[in-house]
Amino acid sequence: GTIATLGHLNPKFKINVLSRRPVAWGPDITAYTKGSYWETRGNMTGKINKCSSDAKEIVSGAQVILICSPAHTKLSILEQIRPHLTEGALVGTIFGQGGFDMQAKYALGDDIKNKNLTIFSLQYVPFICKVINYGKDINIIGPKKHLYVASYPLERVHYVGAVLTHCYWIPSVPVPGFLNMTLCPSNQIIHPGRIYGFFKDWDMKTPFEASKMPKLYEDLDDVSANEIQYLDDEIQAIKKALVAKFPDLMLPQIIPISDRICSMYDGQISDKSSLKRIFNTNTGYSRVPFPMVPVDKKDPSKVVLN
């Protein structure tokens, strides 16, 4: 999604892609917007300048590095790209949960100061996407209303915000520190709550009818919503304890999950009466299936959890 939107909105950008599977990528990526909040913008296509598994070939000379991979892979990626980072580069990720700032400081070490690097992170991914054909096209489902960004050094956060606003054409709001992101998980509490809520009584063997599987978000039930709420309540309790001990600590982004989702998807939610209904009626959460796999590849009608 990032390649398609950045390339489409900024056609003069040169976009290089570091991938373990470079042969799977086409010369460009198309993002289809039908059914999303961005439908009136039409489809977006971004051109890829270069795709390789060689970090030196991809990263050398880059002014902005955006890491778009799961949290547990970021440390190894940072270590891989470190020798090839350019003086003054911005090095960041599209979502900061998982302690990205600590990973970056550990992996990049003295190079942050010696190369005048800026570390940054968005609080949330700019949009939810669903792959159609890997490396070729995707569906954009849920674009965010605003982006929130933190940086190290902190005094560069306004500059980073301006860069990311230019990249995504979504307003980027400065955030006072990475702890706002570490303690503001989204999928890390939404997915466990949803999966447990739906599968808690499953025997781990009996397959499901593929045609009867609910959608991951828009068919969220009361049990799943309650589990997600319990997890979020723990996050709010941690915030309360931290602020009580450190009164000057600024954690404005750590707000209840229902308020957070309504802010992220402003204008896309038709019923805000409960957490369940927020999920059910959010067009930004629509059309996302459960991660299921067929029991038999020849017969996709029976599925189990991936």
Regions found by a protein language model. Name each.
Residues 154-162:
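Short, conserved charged micro-motifs
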Residues 14-16, 92, 118, 148:
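A structural signal for isolated positions on well-ordered beta-strands in alpha/beta enzyme cores
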Residues 171-306:
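C-terminal substrate-binding/catalytic lobe of Rossmann-fold NAD(P)-dependent dehydrogenases
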Residues 41-92:
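Rossmann-like NAD(P)-binding element
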Residues 71-134:
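Rossmann-like NAD(P)(H) cofactor-binding subdomain of soluble oxidoreductases
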Residues 19, 69, 95, 151:
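Short beta-strand/turn micro-motifs composed of small residues
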Residues 134-155, 220:
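Short beta-strand and adjoining strand-loop segment in the mid-core
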Residues 1-40, 59:
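NAD(P)+-binding Rossmann beta1-loop-alpha1 motif at the extreme N-terminus of oxidoreductases
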